[in-house]
Design a protein with these regions (language model features):
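Detector for C-terminal structural segments
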Residues: 54-55, 59-63, 208, 212, ...
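Short helix-initiation/N-cap motifs at beta->coil->alpha
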Residues: 144, 197, 233-245, 258-262, ...
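Surface-exposed binding/hinge segments that line
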Residues: 7, 103, 116, 137-183
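Gly/Pro-rich hinge or "lid" segments in bacterial periplasmic/extracellular proteins
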Residues: 69-77, 170-227, 231, 241, ...
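N-terminal lobe/hinge region of extracytoplasmic solute-binding protein
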Residues: 38-95, 126, 195-198
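Extracellular/periplasmic solute-recognition and catalytic clefts
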Residues: 148-149, 205-216, 233-294, 313, ...
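Aromatic- and charge-enriched surface segment that lines or borders ligand/interaction sites
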Residues: 89-134, 158, 243-246, 296-299, ...
Length: 535
């Protein structure tokens, strides 16, 4: 169906999850109604979940697709609670953890009426794990443990791994792993970039570029009784003021990504108990990525100066009052067992407790590199929260060591195109993941030859080797030691990427929206099958 012109691991993590009254209860769901929700973007860069790494694609198109397994929608904050979507039951691994056999539901249909079988599941997963030439798979590196994918019969899919790893089920539950029709993929593996045709709880009705995407209930959905809603409307709006006004005036019920503290206070103050607020720590942060192919950012001294100039420890409390950022951290989700302690962070460039000492070293490095008073352009995404807030703050921080930085913002599509083509000097980008699993989440910091969404344009065999050792390691203590080495290599020795602050998720929504629970990721739990309206 073409859009018409009218988008686990083993490691236990410590997640903070709070729900402000009125809380989600055990009420009996009601069927019917249309959910209108806001998508904080101008448009998805494409509709292909395998290719993209942005909420703009997930929030627009996830309701129209099925996946093999997913996080439990009743417990989406858990990093280990996975349930079947297209499979019939979660399998136990065999062959010493190297083989996973999934039975596929019989009778599932795509929205065009054709049957969905293991043929389609296997074809979709082969595209994700080993895409054909000219096709991008954003999270291909998540699946380097997969040896082959077999389909012994029309209702069975078998994953055979090269080695056992606790990261596999988390990777399999990634919310972008939509199941496509093999016949279409064989004809054109890029068809799904511009088209939507899945087997999810909702069927596409229309897409008006840059305006809205509309869907209706799939009457043949394979989960009995779902979805509850008759239809959905996603309104695309990059400006926060527009989205807030829509929720305040009840022209929309929710924005699933997250809003800053001021927005929460504004909505609660205006609407009282007509607003429910859900909050969570967020497996998401923004990175500064220098393009190593653009001089002088091929010089580690210049890259190191960029991170040394930034005062994270004093900046975090101030920014947390106006933006969806809160926590100082390294490359690992703060609070998880593999994350650096504050004392360990303070040993890394950019995290020193004495900002004056740090900035003095930044000035020295710039002078040694012949880059005193350097001027450059920071490419940023045209999204208020938190991209433009953080970008403006960074420009000011860098000015304190004599850097002259011009910030250029671009809409989501052109911004991604600039990243992928390497047409930038320094960019602000995200490392936002789904199920909290540090082994997978830090794969972003590998070279682009391994992780296609690494935009630094560098080669680093040492980084690849360190990551592989971590992925194969089964002892938690040794794994943590390897993570510290990998983190120091990435943020201090080479400064391939520069971490800033981790986010905090605040989702205020109309209290009549029920059946949706917050998670540490704005990518999870977005097919909307369990959402219902209490009105």
């Amino acid at each position: 169906m073409k859009p018409q012109t009218y988008l686990a691991g083993r490691i236990a993590v410590l997640l903070t999850l709070a729900i402000v009254t009125p809380a989600i209860g055990e009420e009996k769901p009601r069927s019917g109604g249309i959910l209108t929700y806001m998508i904080p973007a101008d448009a998805p860069p494409s509709f292909d979940g395998h290719r993209e790494a942005t909420y703009a694609t997930v929030h627009a198109a996830a309701p129209y697709y099925s996946v093999l397994i997913r996080v439990n929608p009743e417990n989406p904050a858990s990093p280990t609670d996975f349930v079947c979507d297209l499979c019939t039951e979660m399998p136990q691994p065999t062959d010493d953890g190297r083989t996973y056999t999934f039975k596929i539901r019989d009778g599932v249909k795509f929205h065009d009426g054709s049957p969905l079988t293991a043929v389609d599941v296997a074809a979709s997963w082969r595209k994700i794990v080993d895409p054909p030439e000219g096709v991008t798979s954003a999270r291909q590196s998540f699946y380097i443990m997969v040896d082959k994918i077999e389909m012994p019969d029309p209702l069975t899919v078998v994953f055979r791994l090269k080695f056992p790893t606790s990261a596999f089920l988390s990777a399999l539950a990634d919310p972008y792993t939509w199941i496509y029709k093999k016949e279409i993929l064989d004809r054109d593996p890029r068809w799904y970039e511009k088209n939507i045709m899945g087997s999810g709880p909702f069927k596409l009705v229309s897409y008006e570029a840059g305006q809205a995407i509309r869907g209706e209930r799939n009457p043949y959905y394979y989960h009995k009784g779902l979805p509850y809603l008759d239809g959905i409307v996603g309104i695309l709006a990059p400006k926060q003021a527009t989205r807030l006004d829509a929720i305040r005036s009840d022209r929309a019920a929710i924005e699933f990504r997250g809003l800053p503290p001021s927005a929460r206070e504004e909505l609660v103050g205006a609407l009282g108990d007509k607003i429910t607020v859900q909050t969570s720590d967020w497996n998401c942060g923004l990175l500064v990525t220098p393009n190593h192919k653009k001089k002088p950012f091929d010089d580690v001294r210049v890259r190191r100066a960029l991170t040394l100039a930034v005062d994270r420890w004093h900046g975090a409390p101030a920014l947390s009052k106006i933006a969806i950022m809160r926590t100082v951290g390294g490359i690992v989700f703060p609070g998880s067992p593999l994350a650096a302690t504050k004392e360990e962070l303070e040993q890394l460039a950019g995290f020193w407790p004495d900002i004056e000492e740090s900035r003095s070293e930044a000035r020295r490095l710039l002078k040694d590199a012949g880059a005193e008073g350097l001027g450059f352009e920071l490419l940023n995404r045209d999204v208020d929260q938190p991209f433009k807030y953080l970008g403006t703050w960074l420009v000011d921080e860098w000015s304190k060591v004599g850097l002259k930085v011009n910030q250029r913002v671009a809409p989501t599509g052109p911004w991604f195109e600039s990243l992928r083509s390497g047409n930038f000097e320094v960019t602000l980008e995200g490392n936002c993941q789904s199920v909290v699993n540090p082994l997978l989440d830090v794969s972003k910091y590998q070279p682009s030859s391994v992780f296609t969404e690494q935009y630094g344009n560098f080669d680093d065999l040492a980084a690849i080797d360190l990551y592989q050792k971590m992925l194969h390691e089964t002892d938690p203590a040794r794994q943590r030691a390897l993570m510290r080495t990998f983190e120091r290599h990435t943020l201090d020795d080479q400064v391939h990427n520069i971490t800033t602050l981790w986010w905090y998720r605040i989702v205020p929504h109309r209290s009549y929206v029920k059946g949706w629970k917050i998670s540490p990721s704005h990518f999870l739990n977005q097919d909307l099958a369990t959402v219902w309206l209490d009105r």
